Amino acid sequence: MKRTYQPSKLVRKRRHGFRARMATVGGRRVIAARRARGRKRLSA
């Protein structure tokens, strides 16, 4: 059985990156919530 986490910088950016978040309403909410909490990193 292969492991479920096969790291890839490109896939990580495309799925969880800032621009991916900003592309949807839900993603924008995620960014807003993380800004409100004062997170140092908003996205991947």
Swiss-Prot record:
Record keywords, A-Z: Ribonucleoprotein, Ribosomal protein
An MF annotation (GO) of this entry: structural constituent of ribosome
UniProt GO BP: translation
Coiled coil: none
Gene3D superfamilies: 1.10.287.3980
Keyword Ribosomal protein annotated: yes
Record GO cellular component, one term: ribonucleoprotein complex
InterPro entries associated with the record: Ribosomal_bL34, Ribosomal_bL34_CS
RNA-binding among keywords: no
Signal peptide coordinates: none
Family per record: Belongs to the bacterial ribosomal protein bL34 family.
Name the UniProt record assigns to this protein: Large ribosomal subunit protein bL34
Lineage, top ranks: Bacteria, Pseudomonadati, Pseudomonadota, Alphaproteobacteria, Hyphomicrobiales
Name of the gene: rpmH
